[in-house]
């Protein structure tokens, strides 16, 4: 778990037009895990097709849809965290959020995980040859023990769990966790589907709410390498570091 000093040090997250950056102390800024996967991984064709079809080519409509999905996802995550911390909840008149939490509760009751950490901010300041070993940071949803094994679990409200960036995100969290907690490394990785669009009052028995994924360090390194190659042209605020000096005075 993060200490009070660590929470004070890493609570500042700088937002830029190119994602979020964590201040992990000593003047070091690193991109968030989701920022790396967003800009360091290609967008799958099926997702591009969904974006275009759903927005009908209207960028403002896409932003509206994306904002609502983000609101629902954030609300589901926040409420699941409260439940794990022992709070009782009352959620009314918000069907997608209610269904997302219902799905989470069903998974929890089926698997009965023993909570180890909730929403822990993960980062690593270890260097090798003058460079950070893991030049990224992030907040993992849940680390829990199940069947005498340590699982790292990410909650997702998206319609599908097939996006491979989810595997890369969990792999990045595992790398950070293992660096910070060598006494208890992560054994297995999984996604919990907080499904928000099922029919009826409860997910059916056939609804798959839990998906194990395999650690993929090679893909992490590729995403990080591409991200930093892309980011080299920008400063920490997302502005171009160098701009061409254009002629200002003209005469024939």
Where are the language model's segments positioned?
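Charged, glycine-rich intrinsically disordered N-terminal tails and low-complexity linkers that flank
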Residues: 1-75, 252
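Catalytic cores of nuclease domains that cleave nucleic-acid phosphodiester backbones
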Residues: 7-12, 64-152, 161-165, 180, ...
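A short local loop/turn or secondary-structure capping micro-motif enriched for an aromatic residue
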Residues: 38-40, 160-163
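Residue-level detector of flexible, active-site-proximal loop/helix-junction positions
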Residues: 122, 159, 196-198
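Activation of the activation-loop gatekeeper triad in protein kinase-fold domains
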Residues: 155-156
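Catalytic cores of nucleic-acid endonucleases
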Residues: 168-197
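Acidic Ser/Thr/Pro-rich low-complexity disordered segments
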Residues: 198-207
């Amino acid at each position: 778990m993060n200490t009070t000093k660590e929470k004070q040090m890493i609570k500042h997250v700088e937002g830029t037009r190119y994602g979020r950056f964590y201040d992990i102390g000593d003047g070091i800024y690193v991109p968030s895990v989701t920022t790396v996967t967003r800009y360091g991984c290609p967008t799958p064709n099926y997702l591009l097709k969904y974006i275009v079809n759903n927005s009908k080519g209207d960028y403002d409509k896409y932003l509206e849809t994306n904002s609502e999905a983000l609101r629902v996802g954030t609300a589901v995550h926040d409420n699941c965290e409260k439940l794990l911390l022992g709070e009782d909840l009352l959620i009314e008149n918000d069907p997608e959020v209610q269904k997302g939490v219902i799905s989470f509760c069903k998974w929890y009751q089926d698997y009965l995980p023993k909570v180890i950490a909730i929403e822990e901010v993960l980062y690593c300041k270890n260097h090798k040859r003058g460079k950070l070993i893991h030049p990224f940071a992030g907040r993992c949803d849940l680390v829990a023990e199940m069947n005498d094994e340590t699982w790292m679990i990410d909650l997702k409200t998206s319609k599908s769990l097939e996006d491979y960036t989810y595997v890369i995100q969990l792999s990045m969290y595992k790398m950070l966790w293992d660096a910070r907690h060598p006494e208890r490394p992560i054994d297995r990785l999984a996604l919990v589907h907080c499904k928000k669009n099922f029919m009826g009052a409860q997910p059916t028995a056939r609804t798959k709410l839990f998906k194990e994924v395999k650690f993929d360090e090679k893909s992490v390194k590729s995403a990080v390498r591409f991200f930093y190659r892309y980011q080299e042209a920008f400063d920490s605020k997302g502005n171009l570091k160098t701009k061409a000096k254009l002629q200002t005075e003209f005469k024939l």
